Swiss-Prot record:
Disulfide bonds: none annotated. Its cofactor is Mg(2+). It comes from Syntrophus aciditrophicus (strain SB). The lineage of its organism: Bacteria, Pseudomonadati, Thermodesulfobacteriota, Syntrophia, Syntrophales. This is Polyribonucleotide nucleotidyltransferase. Mg(2+) binds at D494, D500.
Length: 705
């Protein structure tokens, strides 16, 4: 029997329906938001895999094409590998729920979110996050929810909860935030809503406005949090008992006695590879003492070693008031950069921050190089593309090269969002822009190095960017009332810390953000401090970028295509293309240019050879030229009739050469002067209101073209 719980969410009804689908899953719900319907199932195994001391969580979000009444393309006519949107949404759900499972819960867990119906107004990712939380809430899987995801936009200075696609496009702020109920509340409230996950993009919006948008979004969540409370109270199963991977005090004390001093010495090594080599040696020496038949003890010992490492890193920062590489809390690592290092790329930069290094390369193309994405909710075309690569050698590993994983796609998407607000419009810069960031060395904040390197290679390539963007990763350590915020975190600080908060922007404001936390949530005070400290760091990095290259180059690379845009009348587009593409193929064949023709009459010609471009432009103008009264043309006789001949003076443009205009003397028969296929010089006498053209041969005789 199905049960439905409903509430108002952003002025629209939202319903959670459960009890009649996927009955063998531990938890299964449907969320209905307008005509958007998402089903999420949650299953967690009852026995843990041997040797696993972490949460093996998998989240798969999939959009079925039938959800929008479509049939998939391709030979097999079925859904294939997840697209970028599906991967990014899977990551959002994963990052939101992962920190809310109990410590020591190491049972394989899978959530599958299936979009069954989609409309153009209600975001399926908002519905999917709610369904994921609700499925876990009613299941017996241990989970510290409920959580709610909400999108916040801002149009004309007004915040909007769950804006439509049109409102998102019009706005200057687009946040996706996830909040969690925290009991008891402050200021007399029964509960607070703390931030669990955040990502967003903005048009250089100031920090205060971003914080106001987050506060607005957290308040919007309350009706749906209470809706889940009703659902759990009515239908929730008792949470299962489980055997946690625990570290007893005696084992931790024993491991600490054997390894703590050496670990502290290792964490004084500033170079990552030296530090990790020393730590590996310490771990191996401790684990060797555990015999093979004591598998459970070996696992607990490994967990104790990891806990000890985290404790040491946190103690150094919280108690000794310094970081493992000797920096102060707000200090940025040493930065160096250079541009123009790849001769044939259209722009390039090498950006170094500490031991993190990004090689960013730029390629410019035409509109035919745009990325076309076909999603269930509609198509998207991108003229700015950014790809992030994280090869194994950048962290000193050797493993097979694979296609980009979820992490690489997520980092590339974040860097693209960060740079997008300063990319010139197609009218200002009619190029397709592709940046590739190769991470050559990584010790934290590689996605932020991609932002900085990407901006540098744009400037090196002569792209007229609207501002200078930099990115910085902020960390957090929180114990009781003690809160420490770190700027430009190392990989080890990220691993031992409670937050990874990436903030990108210009000197004017924020362009993109992404926050992941490992604790139950953060409040506004921590968020405000982190953003203020991030701004200081961002401005410092911007100064370093400007010291490398102060403004975009005035000229493009000599190897970049030169794009010229010619406007023709829309009715002349067919003349440019020609029958079966004959004319456009001829232009390409004779000049070697790349040419694109839009239905609105925009003709784009691209070539690194300016003479070839000039020839192609002349051919286009000739193909689309209008007949000019008084001008002499060399035409071809297309048809002969009793009263004259029809002469093509321009491609697709014919005029009437009357028998009386053939010669100065009287002509009795048209074919005495001209026949079909003859070339003839004529003068345009008149173009009437209907576009009909009168020609004269006798007035053109003796004239030169």
């Amino acid at each position: 029997m199905s049960t439905i719980f409903s509430a108002e969410f952003a002025g629209r009804n939202i319903s959670i329906k459960t009890g009649y689908v996927a009955g063998q899953a531990d938890g299964a719900v449907m969320v209905i938001y307008g005509d958007t319907v998402v089903m999420v199932t949650a299953v967690s195994l009852k026995t843990a895999r041997e040797g696993v001391d972490f949460l093996p969580l998998t989240v798969d979000y999939q959009e079925m094409t039938y959800a929008a009444g479509k049939i998939p393309g391709g030979f097999f006519k079925r859904e294939g590998r997840p697209n970028e949107r599906e991967i990014l949404t899977s990551r959002v759900i994963d990052r939101s729920i992962r920190p809310l499972f109990p410590k020591g819960y190491c049972y394989e867990t899978q959530l599958v979110a299936t979009v069954l119906s989609v409309d153009s107004e209600n975001d399926s990712d908002v519905a999917a996050l709610l369904a994921a939380s609700a499925a876990l809430e009613i299941s017996d899987i241990p989970f510290k929810g409920p959580i709610v995801g909400v999108r916040v936009g801002r149009v004309d200075g007004q915040f909007i909860c769950n804006p439509s696609k049109l409102e998102q496009e019009k706005g200057d702020l687009n946040l996706y935030l996830v909040g969690r109920k925290v009991v008891p509340g402050t200021e007399g409230r029964p509960y607070d809503v703390n931030l669990v996950m955040l990502e967003g993009e903005a048009q250089q919006v100031e920090e205060e406005h971003v914080i106001a948008g987050i506060d607005f979004g957290l308040e919007c969540m309350r009706p749906v949090i209470e809706l889940q409370d009703q659902l759990r109270s009515a239908l929730g199963k008792p949470k299962r008992e489980f055997e946690a991977v625990e570290i007893d005090d005696a084992l931790l004390a024993e491991v600490s006695e054997k390894a703590a001093v050496r670990m502290r010495e290792a964490y004084r090594m500033s170079r990552k590879l030296d530090r990790h080599a020393a730590l590996d040696e310490i771990r191996n020496s401790v684990l060797k003492a555990v015999t093979a038949d004591e598998a459970g003890l070996r696992l607990r010992t490994a967990a104790a070693l990891e806990a000890l490492e985290k404790r040491i890193v946190r103690d150094v920062i919280l108690k000794e008031k310094q970081r493992i590489d000797g920096r102060s809390y707000a200090e940025i690592r040493a930065i160096s950069a250079e541009v123009g290092i790849l001769p044939r790329a259209h722009g390039s930069a090498l950006f170094n921050r500490g031991e993190t290094q990004s090689l960013a390369a730029l390629a410019l193309g035409t509109s035919s190089d745009e990325q076309r994405l076909d999603y269930v909710a509609g198509e998207e075309t991108r003229s700015f593309i950014l790809h992030y690569n994280f090869p194994p050698y950048c962290v000193g590993e050797a493993r097979p090269l694979r296609s980009p994983g979820r992490r690489e796609i997520g980092h590339g998407n974040l860097a693209r969002k960060a740079l997008m607000p300063v990319i010139p419009s197609p009218e200002e810069f009619p190029y397709t822009i592709r940046i590739v960031s190769e991470i050559l060395s990584s010790n934290g904040s590689s996605s932020m190095a991609t932002v900085c390197g990407g901006l540098l290679c744009l400037m090196d390539g002569g792209v007229p960017v609207k501002g200078v963007v930099a990115g910085i990763a902020m960390g957090l350590l929180k114990e009781g009332e003690q809160v420490v915020i770190l700027s430009d975190i190392l990989g080890d600080e990220d691993h031992a810390g409670d937050m990874d908060f990436k903030v990108c922007g210009t000197s004017k404001g924020i362009t993109a953000m992404q926050m992941d936390i490992k604790i139950d949530g953060i409040n506004e005070d921590i968020l405000r401090k982190a953003l203020a400290q991030a701004r200081e760091g961002r401005l410092f990095i911007i100064d370093k970028i400007l010291a490398t290259i102060s403004e975009p180059r005035k000229e493009l690379s000599i190897y970049a295509p030169r794009i010229t845009t010619v406007k023709v009348k829309p009715e002349k587009v067919r003349a440019v293309i020609g029958t079966g593409g004959k004319n456009i193929r001829q232009i390409v064949s004779e000049t070697g240019v790349t040419i694109d023709v839009e239905d609105d009459g925009t003709v784009t010609i691209a070539s690194s050879d300016m003479e070839a471009s000039a020839r192609a432009i002349a051919m286009v103008r000739w193909l689309t030229e209008d007949a000019e009264v008084g001008k002499i043309y060399r035409g071809t006789v297309k048809k002969v009739v009793d009263f004259g001949a029809f002469v093509e003076i321009l491609p697709g443009t014919e005029g009437l050469l009357h028998i009386s205009q053939l010669a100065k003397e009287r002509v009795n028969k048209v074919t005495d002067i001209v026949n079909e296929g003859d070339e003839v010089i004529v003068k345009v006498l008149e173009v009437d209101k209907q576009g009909k053209i009168r020609l004269s041969r006798k007035e053109a005789l003796g004239s030169d073209i």
